[in-house]
């Protein structure tokens, strides 16, 4: 098992990777008012960030295999912090989006490196436990982030961006930890052939499709549409939106905390099927909930779906390859995440503009059905489990 300093770095990187979107969700309506934006235009503050992440994630995976984890991690932390600081001084919406692109360039490597570092530091026996703890810790962060973002947003929409400076002490900590060294000269032909063979496996494709759909169900109807609906329908302030939205993270934390016990009894497919129902059911009635605080129940269930599904998918993807090609495989998975995070906010914003909130949540319901179908038809009852 890794030491305390190693674990602190690991959890710190995971918390930062979850901060880029959840911290600013409560101030999206305030941004829209300040700059006179539509729902789709306001959603670009998420899309620009996640598109930059999606671009950098596969690059970061290969570079960390070739040049070592530190050569990628340290610059990523500095760029991530720098982009957030620049947002504090942005004068126009165009400036905000440019700063978010810069920040996303730094965030891309963080999203894949926390899983790579976990797989480097922890043996296969203990990896599921660590992945569950990483998700639980991340969920604790995402409980706090919307609340902090909402409270700071009462002062100014810019204020939450100051929190991104927490990447700077994490960068200092990374200098004190011994990370995986560069491999030196690589046989690129063998590297890509071996990686390609793994990526073409049915299980691997199933994992990547699942992770795409899971994040689509999160970032479209929940992360993008709910804050805008909360202001339009319930006239909620940034702080109230942040408090209610924190129930997503509470559900995710509790589900992830209990996941190791559930994983010991249930197969991968069973867990994903349960998660699929938890993704689907809240979206069936979220648009018709009569009050803001009653939305906490479907948001909690949606968060539980994340806590049940994402850690075990990441766990299984991390064990697909060898240490030599692990980063490239995880980078493909994280790229699927970032593409989903980029496409779904824009898509669901357009749907909500044309068919209102009922249309957006009905589309999210359809995504949940797809998760159930993939889990049922791609994976066997006792396969794709990290217990193997």
Residue ranges and their predicted role:
Residues 55-91:
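Conserved MFS/SLC helix-loop-helix module at the cytosolic interface between two early adjacent transmembrane helices
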């Amino acid at each position: 098992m890794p030491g305390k300093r190693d674990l602190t770095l690991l959890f710190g990187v995971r918390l930062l990777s979850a901060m880029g979107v959840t911290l600013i969700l409560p101030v999206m309506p305030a941004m829209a008012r300040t700059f006179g934006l539509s729902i789709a235009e306001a959603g670009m503050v998420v899309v620009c960030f996640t598109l930059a992440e999606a671009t950098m994630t596969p690059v970061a995976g290969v570079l960390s295999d070739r040049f070592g984890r530190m050569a990628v991690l340290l610059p990523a932390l500095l760029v991530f912090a720098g982009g957030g600081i620049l947002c504090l001084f942005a004068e126009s919406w165009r400036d905000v989006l440019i700063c978010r692109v810069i920040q996303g360039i730094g965030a891309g490597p963080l999203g894949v490196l926390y899983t790579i570092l976990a797989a480097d530091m922890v043996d296969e026996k203990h990896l599921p436990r660590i992945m569950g703890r990483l998700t639980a810790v991340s969920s604790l962060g995402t409980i706090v982030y919307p609340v902090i973002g909402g409270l700071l947003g009462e002062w100014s929409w810019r204020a939450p961006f100051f929190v991104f400076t927490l990447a700077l002490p994490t960068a200092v900590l990374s200098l004190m930890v011994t990370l995986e060294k560069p491999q030196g000269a690589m046989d690129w032909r063998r590297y890509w052939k071996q990686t390609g063979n793994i990526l073409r496996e049915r299980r691997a494709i199933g994992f990547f499709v699942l992770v795409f759909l899971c994040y689509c169900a999160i970032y479209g109807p929940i992360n993008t549409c709910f804050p805008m609906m909360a202001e339009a329908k319930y006239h909620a302030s940034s702080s109230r939106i942040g408090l209610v939205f924190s129930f997503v993270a509470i559900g995710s934390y509790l589900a992830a905390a209990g996941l190791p016990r559930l994983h010991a009894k249930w197969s991968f497919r069973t867990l994903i099927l349960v998660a699929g129902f938890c993704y689907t059911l809240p979206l069936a009635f979220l648009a018709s909930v009569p009050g803001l605080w009653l939305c906490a129940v479907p948001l909690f269930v949606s968060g539980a779906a994340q806590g049940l599904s994402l850690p075990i998918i990441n766990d299984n993807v991390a064990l697909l390859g060898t240490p030599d090609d692990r980063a490239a495989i995880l980078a493909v998975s994280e790229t699927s995440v970032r593409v989903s995070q980029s496409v779904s906010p824009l898509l669901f914003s357009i749907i909500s503009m044309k068919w209102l909130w009922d249309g957006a949540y009905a589309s999210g319901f359809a995504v949940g059905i797809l998760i159930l179908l993939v889990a049922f038809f791609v994976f066997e009852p006792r396969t794709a489990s990290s217990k193997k």
